[in-house]
Amino acid sequence: FIFAKEIARQAEQPVLILTGRSALNADQQAELNELQQLGARAEYRQVDVTQTEAASELITSITSDYEDLNGVIHSAGLIKDNYLMSKTNEELTQVLAPKVKGLVNVDEATEHLALDFFILFSSISSVAGSAGQADYAMANAFMDSYAAYRNALVTAMYRHGQTLSINWPLWKEGGMRANKEIENMTLKNTGVTPMRTETSIQALYKGLAFGKDQVIV
């Protein structure tokens, strides 16, 4: 919701479609109400984009309802901390699916649309690694590589819109925020504090301005 709020503040009466696999809860409904108070036409659609048909139906329904789709922010992700040797195939699949299968499905479902941007929320773990998160790091590394792949398709005129993969650090607020235990451990081991909302918004703007496939925050 952090970036949806920024769009609502900066754009005039934007249409914002937020999606997720889970049913809308009370906190999310409150944030939707806030987006609407900011002037946005905001709604939530429950969908699992790791299912090819569901992703296709989502994009079809959006373009049917609103005639156009200007951009995509793919921020799906799931963490199941454990050492790789201890993880089951099911756990690996659950972690990889949102950032791998989900990304491919959404990209292919929008391949015919003249998007302005296609932004991928990756993680610093794909660059620096993270204990107990080998599968998560791999999923994010896929996103980084996919950004370059999609930009090549844009150059070849098979896709539209700038693709950018952003390697985010720990967050202070929002849906990707770290819990207090991880926050304290990271501070102790690295001296790094979680990123605040204002920093993330500026990082997104600057990342888009750089015109690169990938930026590390």
Q: What kind of region is each of these model predictions?
A:
Residues 1-217:
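4′-phosphopantetheine-dependent carrier domains
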